Amino acid sequence: MFVSSRKTGLIVCFSLIGYTASAFSASLNPAERNETQQRQSEVIEQSRQQREALQQLNNIVQAPLKADNALQGPCFTLREIRFNHSTLLGQRDQTALTAGYLNRCNNLEQINQLMHDVSNWYIQRGYITSRAFLSEQDLSGGVLQLEILEGRLEKITINNQTERMTRTAFPAREGEILNLRDIEQGMEQMNRMPSQQVTIEILPGSQPGYSVVNLTREAHLPFTGGVTFDNSGQKSTGEQQLNGSLALDNLFGVADQWFISAGHSSRFATSHDAESLQAGFSMPYGYWNLGYSYSQSRYRNTFISRDFPWHSTGDSDTHRLSLSRVVFRNGTMKTAIVGMLSQRTGNNYLNGTLLPSSSRKLSSVSLGVNHSQKLWGGLATFNPTYNRGVRWLGAETDTDKSADEPRAEFNKWTLSASYYYPLTDSITYLGSLYGQYSARALYGSEQMTLGGESSVRGFREQYTSGNRGAYWRNELNWQAWQLPVLGNVTFMAAVDGGHLYNHKQDDSTAASLWGGAVGVTVASRWLSQQVTVGWPISYPAWLQPDTVVVGYRVGLSF
């Protein structure tokens, strides 16, 4: 059938108007919507990993010194206290430790207390194989000689064998003073790989003052993977999704981890379809971590306007390079600095014709802090981040843009935080907060959304997006019982809420959403099954959400 160019233009115009109107609450294209959901899911997963790592920290408790009347004896006035063979005790620390003992008469019990205080100074800072002791000496001259043994690392072994990966996973080096925090960091780097789970023992070395750190590792295959089936997709591109993932551990023997995952609409339809691919690696070096990831997303949707079929398609490719450094850790907290460079290219087409207004390349850099801490009997995370759009790598710029156009060279601040608290042995509370702020309008791929399994539960197809806002997630989990073969049965109840604030160029983005959900998960080592039922509680009238949202997920792991 022949259609004139003028008529074609009118059809396109009316079709786009109709398509936009039908998606009033969903201003993002399917690729952007998928990316924002993935980003929100990554925030949840990152907080979970931070809390798990926090549980592995060892808080060293100072042991009280038991009084021994047999040590009292005569007292000696001490004019000077020397710390022999100490490289870590600075002058200020020495002054603080000896302040209560100088120029006063001390008996052997008090001198023993001083040795205990000095040893605990080392232990509290993670130097668990260092200690102070006395050698035979004459105290009548008023000078006390404290001998300091700063225990050193002889070697790190795995199952009593030396392996190359310990050199990249552990910041500790042979011959250096042994610090528990360096060992914990290395264990954390190892345990991030499922096939390299280890336990630790510290053994005497072959020479005095030296120790061997031996890691015990059970035999596992060097890869893990899984397949999942769920209904997390969008109606326009297919609700039922089939996903597969594979992770390879220690491929090059340097504690490196490689992963790849792919997803596809389970119906593999020609008119409505979505597919995704993610791949990347992470590589540690002591307190540093280098990571790279690539993600690809494709969608296809067919809609009818004026009895004419229109094919809406799109694709996006995202590269992310990250570098992080743990700058502080002790027995109760850990803090890391994280930097990232990202590039995203997105293209959208209508009947095979590129739509320049919604196709672009954006680059950005970010700098953030990842902090986790044991707090009030629970586990807390706090991660602020600054994001800046840049012109690098051929990205779009803001040259000659009007004031109300979205910014490619944007400034954006985000904050994610969480708090996990065990109410009983089987009931836990988890609260999560996420916020975003930008003074100027953002493109859809940089906006935040409200509504969905990873933001405000109780909504799925209907959501709202904007440049600034926040949401708060609350859930109670009850691990009820364990079934043979099927595994643990856990019940969940959640109430979430969020708000997007007005932007002066886009008043329609203002909205408050509240939703609730209940669910049950049955999970074992190999099989997991989950069903959730959600419902909207409060929302703007124009959103018109579904009355009830049912989600399900079945997964197999190996």
From Swiss-Prot:
Its main location: membrane. The keyword Signal applies. It holds the Pfam family ShlB. GO terms for biological process: monoatomic ion transport; protein secretion by the type V secretion system. PROSITE patterns: POTRA. GO terms for cellular component: cell outer membrane; pore complex; type V protein secretion system complex. Residues 1-25 form the signal peptide. GO terms for molecular function: porin activity; protein transmembrane transporter activity. InterPro entries: Hemolysn_activator_HlyB_C, Polypept-transport_assoc_ShlB, POTRA, ShlB_POTRA, TPS, TPS_OM_transporter. It is found in: Cell outer membrane. Gene3D superfamilies: membrane protein fhac (3.10.20.310), membrane protein fhac: a member of the omp85/tpsb transporter family (2.40.160.50). There are 2 cdiBAI loci in this strain, this is locus 2. This is Outer membrane transporter CdiB. It comes from Dickeya dadantii (strain 3937).
